[in-house]
Amino acid sequence: MATFIPVDEFDLVIFGGTGDLALRKLLPALYHRVSDGQITGGSRIIAASRRDVARDDYLATVEDALRRYLPDGEFRDEQWADMRDRIYYAQCDAQTPDQWHALVDLLQGTEDRVRVAYLATAPALFGPIAQGLAANGLVTGNSRIVLEKPLGRDYESACEINN
């Protein structure tokens, strides 16, 4: 039997939170981490996307995705209730960082915890998102960025993203 060690409280911001990668892969994986007791306390999962979606509507979308993409019999109402309480939604267009008010408000007061920005977006948005995080004061000593592969179309575009 595997042993799972709970992690410290964190905020995970998934840019591209309404996309296929988030709904099909990331959120089911996070559901497993919640179910195994690895994500505890006040840890939050914040989906960020340019779409104007109410939180309840986003939660319904996530529940539907979990029921669809988890293996048969793995979805449990109790684990979903725990995960649902951790999920937030912020409308946030990567191209207009001066309009990230919803995300800034959600992250205000949590500067001491680990803050992970998961960029489940097109590589062309990696730079604007990183710049938007900095411009909005969302980068702390505990901040991390996770980039979804591939990085660019070729060597030159990968170097451009990396710089």
Where are these regions (language model features)?
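N-terminal low-complexity, Ser/Thr- and acidic-residue-enriched intrinsically disordered segments
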Residues: 1-57, 104-105
